[in-house]
Amino acid sequence: MSSQQYQQQRRKFAAAFLALIFILAAVDTAEAGKKEKPEKKVKKSDCGEWQWSVCVPTSGDCGLGTREGTRTGAECKQTMKTQRCKIPCNWKKQFGAECKYQFQAWGECDLNTALKTRTGSLKRALHNADCQKTVTISKPCGKLTKPKPQAESKKKKKEGKKQEKMLD
């Protein structure tokens, strides 16, 4: 290798080395120049807790509906708002559409009142609804009801009738 080639290679190496140092210095100063964001200050609000009305179904007595919320406070930006809600259609409405109860089996028939009763304990309340812890319901004793015939029992009856016709 000639001295001229050697010097040329050395200059290239020195230029690359200086470029690397320059890039590292630029990156370091860019990171140092960034300001750390101060944590957001938590505002202590004068606003009170939201108080929600009961869910009012859009149509019928269950399904989708709306509820209104209000809160108090001198410096509140929003004191009223409307929220979507849903009333399950399989819940017993007489205890409040937002209260779900777990019921025990029906009790024995009371001959004096001709009613049988059962109690339910609160299983779930939607949207902080005001629900009773336990409820009691009554219904007339009435006749003993037979369970509805299942599809299988209908098939058995049909097969039995077919056999009777064949024997005739």
Curated annotation (Swiss-Prot):
PROSITE patterns linked: PTN_MK_1, PTN_MK_2
InterPro entries: Midkine_heparin-bd_GF (IPR000762), PTN/MK_C_dom (IPR020090), PTN/MK_C_dom_sf (IPR038130), PTN/MK_diS_sf (IPR020091), PTN/MK_N_dom (IPR020089), PTN/MK_N_dom_sf (IPR037122), PTN_MK_heparin-bd_GF_CS (IPR020092)
Location of the region described as Disordered in the Swiss-Prot/TrEMBL record: 139-168
Region Chondroitin sulfate A binding, residue ranges: 147-168
Protein name: Pleiotrophin
Oligomer status and interactors: Interacts with ALK and NEK6. Interacts with PTPRZ1 (via chondroitin sulfate groups); promotes formation of homooligomers; oligomerization impairs tyrosine phosphatase activity. Forms a complex with PTPRZ1 and CTNNB1; this complex inactivates PTPRZ1 protein tyrosine phosphatase activity through PTN interaction and stimulates tyrosine phosphorylation of CTNNB1. Interacts with ITGB3 and ITGA5. Forms a complex with PTPRZ1 and integrin alpha-V/beta-3 (ITGAV:ITGB3) that stimulates endothelial cell migration through ITGB3 'Tyr-773' phosphorylation.
Disulfide-linked positions: 47-76, 55-85, 62-89, 99-131, 109-141
GO cellular component: basement membrane; cell surface; extracellular region; extracellular space; neuromuscular junction; perinuclear region of cytoplasm; plasma membrane; postsynapse
UniProt organism field: Rattus norvegicus (Rat)
One Pfam family linked to the record: PTN_MK_N
Source organism phylogeny: Eukaryota, Metazoa, Chordata, Craniata, Vertebrata
Residue ranges, annotated region (Chondroitin sulfate binding): 92-99, 123-131
Function: Secreted growth factor that mediates its signal through cell-surface proteoglycan and non-proteoglycan receptors. Binds cell-surface proteoglycan receptor via their chondroitin sulfate (CS) groups. Thereby regulates many processes like cell proliferation, cell survival, cell growth, cell differentiation and cell migration in several tissues namely neuron and bone. Also plays a role in synaptic plasticity and learning-related behavior by inhibiting long-term synaptic potentiation.
Keyword field: Disulfide bond, Growth factor, Heparin-binding, Mitogen, Secreted, Signal
Tissue-level expression: Expressed in brain. Hardly expressed in bone. Abundantly expressed in the growth plate. Intensely expressed in the cartilage matrix that forms the hollow for the secondary ossification center. Is expressed selectively by the osteocytes of the lamellar bone, whereas it is hardly expressed by those of the woven bone. Is detected in the matrix surrounding the osteocytes and in the canaliculi of the osteocytes. Is distributed on the surface of lamellar bone.
PTM comment: Phosphorylated by NEK6.
GO MF annotation list: carbohydrate binding; chondroitin sulfate binding; chondroitin sulfate proteoglycan binding; glycosaminoglycan binding; growth factor activity; heparan sulfate binding; heparin binding; integrin binding
Subcellular location, principal: secreted
One annotated GO biological process: oogenesis
Location in or out of the cell: Secreted
First and last residue of the signal peptide: 1-32
Family listed: Belongs to the pleiotrophin family.
